[in-house]
């Protein structure tokens, strides 16, 4: 276990963000594909069960043991209360006792607020993607945390979580991303939603995944990963193999969803990679929109 060195945390005060309600999916989200995802879910569930069975103090005493099931290298269990205070953080014990509702990553994403949002909207667990340094490092990397709400024997509720750095992208991550974007468009209004989608603090881009919005004729309205494409009609666009993938997206029926496979570069790159995008077609005020996001194959 490397020694814990000084870690730089970024605290940013930003305007209130417009958060969509947690989405009701157009199709059932695909199950986790990778073993590391399943193991993380099991770890967090077991940790939450331990808090529920033995109480916070006893559970945290176990979570803090280096080399244990709960704390191995860069993987550790953390616990927050519902007021946003860290009550157990083995990797950064200096955070314990601090109210961290305004803790934000370098993109401005409110990390603890995002944890709370996942477990306060009728779901006992959820996923949050953000930038965070590994233990002993000051370099921020993409991290995906799985969080779960649990109740200790004394009746106090807590958020228990753990995360992985630069984990494999699951298809259900982008299904949730697209569904959140659709709910935002239908509840906040198109113009306000476009502003929120482009805001890096709101999480509509993480890792290589990003949201895009086309109108029913193929005009690119929002593209978080490739903003230079906005304002262009891409209906006739082909990938490197000659596939008219935008036409396939536009062919999705109103109210339906589909997965479209094609070749497309990752953000910041020019060489095409294999990509599969999940798209939904919706109608708002008489205008059709195709909302999508995708995963790149490794």
Labelled PLM ranges:
Residues 1-4:
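N-terminal secretory signal peptides that target proteins for export/translocation
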Residues 8-20:
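Bacterial N-terminal signal peptides
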Residues 24-298:
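N-terminal membrane-sensor/transducer module of prokaryotic signaling receptors
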């Amino acid at each position: 276990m490397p020694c814990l060195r000084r870690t730089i945390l970024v605290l940013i005060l930003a305007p209130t963000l417009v958060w969509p309600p947690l989405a009701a999916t157009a199709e059932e989200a695909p199950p986790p594909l990778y073993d590391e995802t399943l193991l993380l879910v099991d770890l967090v569930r077991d940790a939450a069960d331990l808090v529920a069975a033995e109480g916070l103090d006893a559970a945290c005493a176990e979570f803090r043991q280096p080399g244990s099931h709960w704390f191995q290298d860069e993987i550790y269990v953390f616990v927050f209360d519902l007021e946003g205070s860290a009550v157990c953080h083995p990797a950064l014990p200096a955070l314990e006792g601090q109210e961290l509702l305004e803790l934000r990553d370098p993109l401005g994403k409110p990390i603890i607020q995002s944890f709370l949002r996942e477990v306060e909207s009728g779901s006992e667990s959820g996923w949050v993607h953000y930038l965070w340094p590994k233990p002993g490092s000051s370099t921020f990397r993409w991290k995906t945390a799985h969080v779960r709400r649990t109740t200790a024997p004394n009746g106090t509720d807590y958020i228990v979580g753990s995360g992985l750095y630069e984990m494999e992208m699951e298809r259900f991550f982008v299904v949730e991303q697209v569904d959140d974007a659709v709910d935002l468009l239908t509840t906040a209004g198109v113009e306000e939603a476009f502003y929120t989608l482009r805001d890096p603090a709101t999480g509509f881009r993480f890792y290589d995944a990003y949201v895009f919005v086309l109108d029913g004729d193929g005009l690119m309205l929002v593209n978080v990963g490739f903003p230079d494409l906005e304002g262009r009609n891409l209906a006739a666009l082909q990938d490197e193999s000659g596939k008219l993938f935008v036409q396939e997206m536009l062919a999705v029926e109103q109210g339906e969803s589909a997965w479209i496979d094609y070749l497309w570069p990752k953000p910041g790159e020019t060489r095409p990679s294999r990509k599969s995008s999940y798209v939904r077609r919706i109608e708002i005020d008489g205008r059709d929109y195709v909302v999508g996001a995708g995963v790149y194959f490794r």
